[in-house]
From Swiss-Prot:
The active site is at residue 254. GTP binds at residues 11, 71, 144-145, 179, 206, 228. The lineage of its organism: Eukaryota, Viridiplantae, Streptophyta, Embryophyta, Tracheophyta. Its EC number is 3.6.5.-. This is Tubulin alpha-1 chain. Dimer of alpha and beta chains. A typical microtubule is a hollow water-filled tube with an outer diameter of 25 nm and an inner diameter of 15 nM. Alpha-beta heterodimers associate head-to-tail to form protofilaments running lengthwise along the microtubule wall with the beta-tubulin subunit facing the microtubule plus end conferring a structural polarity. Microtubules usually have 13 protofilaments but different protofilament numbers can be found in some organisms and specialized cells. Residues 431-450 are annotated as: Disordered. Mg(2+) binds at residue 71. GO terms for cellular component: cytoplasm; microtubule; nucleus; plasma membrane. It comes from the Eukaryota. Pfam families: Tubulin, Tubulin_C. Its cofactor is Mg(2+). Keywords: Cytoplasm, Cytoskeleton, GTP-binding, Hydrolase, Magnesium, Metal-binding, Microtubule, Nucleotide-binding, Phosphoprotein.
């Protein structure tokens, strides 16, 4: 088996995790207490869904996941929630005091105490796997725990599980909506380690997803649950092929191979279609070309940046439901014929497609309508650099006055780490610029960086 372990860090990671596991359980017919009435082979571990769930001899299905937070309130909601019997109690790890929006607390002081417990759990989970394929890491980089503890854990995973893929689903601070003053610091410090210790990162941004909820689902004031439902649909679509047997399956390592042209350029945009409320769904039909066109719409991107400002290097289209390869080929050909969607000149094909016949499920009482087919796209576009330059700009404004820096230094960080991380991001922006530049004749000079 090719198992995958999910790691949910900090409040954002855990709440997105709740939505995801709720959806996985629905899709596989697993009850909130972990039983699966439809599973004929009790205790045997060779069904496709065993990539995400391990199975006990009594027929209980346990998520291969760890929830990790420095303070207990969010994890306590999982401990007392609907799915409390689903998770192994030792997989829900919480500390006593939180990181207070401070990267240094999550990374150096408070986080250090909890990270070994977490690695111990991960080691046990990994021992239960026959062929561990990699990790999915869910966190946000604006707060203290997601950024600080998230980075610390990624660094330790690189040491303990060197060659295993690490895919990040990371919530980046939004341009207009901010939840903490020091977000730019935490994001820059944390991106510094995402650059080195993850293989692919899918950028998500609350503001972009708010806009999608408002526009497409007619929710006037979207809550985090609305956002997380949409995020979990996207993540579910990306992992469908790992959990079900499909027509064209896509492995975790295939994402890497097809999407990452250079090791540092691994930050992806994602989009999902059709996002439609139940009220409207009756009156519309969504053909494969239609949903394919809409995942390329700038307004459907789950991060605030405009793909028209950049060029695509590669994209992965994951279809699910009633879709046949012939439709996909036609739709992709139509996209290629469009002049609006630009690819870099050194990557002429640029499309990787996956198809899975399992139709999308929806959470009862959720916002999304039940549809016959859906598509999720992850794309590598040079416009992602906009996200970084925005955060860098805010970082510079604060750091030029050394505002708030003493909180970080007081927790055992050195000022040098700020400038080091900032320089790394400046180099990243430059990398994106060069990759998107015309012609590939300057490749030889680029070679020294990697």
């Amino acid at each position: 088996m090719r198992e995958i372990i999910s790691i949910h860090i900090g409040q954002a990671g855990i709440q997105v995790g709740n939505s995801c596991w709720e959806l996985y359980c629905l899709e596989h017919g697993i009850q909130p207490d972990g039983t699966m009435p439809s599973d004929s082979t009790v205790g045997a571990c060779h069904d496709a869904f065993n990539t995400f769930f391990s199975e006990t001899s009594s027929g209980q299905h346990v998520p291969r996941a760890v929830f990790l937070d420095l303070e207990p309130t969010v994890i306590d909601e999982v401990r007392t929630g609907t799915y409390r019997q689903l998770f192994h109690p030792e997989q829900l790890i919480s500390g006593k005091e939180d990181a207070a929006n401070n990267f240094a607390r999550g990374h150096y002081t408070v986080g250090r105490e909890i990270v070994d417990t977490c690695l111990e759990r991960l080691r046990k989970l990994a021992d239960n796997c026959t062929g561990l394929q990699g990790f999915l890491v869910f966190n946000a980089v604006g707060g203290g725990t997601g950024s600080g503890l998230g980075s610390l854990l990624l660094e330790r995973l690189s040491v303990d599980f060197g060659k295993k893929s690490k895919l990040g689903f990371t919530i980046y601070p939004s341009p207009q909506v901010s939840t903490a003053v020091v977000e730019p610091y935490n994001s820059v410090l944390s991106t510094h380690s995402l650059l080195e210790h993850t293989d692919v990162v899918v950028l998500l941004d609350n503001e972009a997803i708010y806009d999608i909820c408002r526009r497409s689902l007619d929710i006037e004031r979207p809550t985090y649950s609305n956002l997380n439902r949409l995020i979990s649909q996207t993540i579910s679509s990306l992992t469908t092929s790992l959990r079900f047997d499909g027509a064209i399956n896509v492995d975790i390592t295939e994402f890497q191979t097809n999407l990452v042209p250079y090791p540092r350029i691994h930050f992806m945009l994602s989009s999902y279609a059709p996002v439609i409320s139940s009220a409207k769904a009756y009156h519309e039909q969504f053909s494969v070309p239609e949903i394919t066109t809409s995942v390329f719409e700038p307004s459907n991107m789950m991060a605030k940046c405009d793909p028209r400002h950049g060029k695509y290097m590669a994209c992965c289209l994951m279809y699910r439901g009633d879709v046949v390869p012939k439709d996909v080929n036609t739709a992709v050909a139509a996209i290629k014929a469009k002049r609006t969607i630009q690819f870099v000149d050194w990557c002429p094909t640029g499309f990787k497609c996956g198809i899975n016949y399992q139709p999308p499920s929806v959470v009862p009482g959720g916002d999304l309508a039940k549809v016959q087919r859906a598509v999720c796209m992850i794309s590598n576009n040079t416009a992602v650099a906009e996200v970084f330059s925005r955060i860098d700009h805010k970082f510079d404004l604060m750091y030029s006055k050394r505002a708030f820096v003493h909180w970080y230094v007081g927790e055992g960080m050195e000022e040098g780490e700020f400038s080091e991380a900032r320089e790394d991001l400046a180099a990243l922006e430059k990398d994106y610029e060069e990759v998107g530049g015309e012609g590939a004749e300057d490749d030889d000079e680029e070679g020294d960086e990697y």
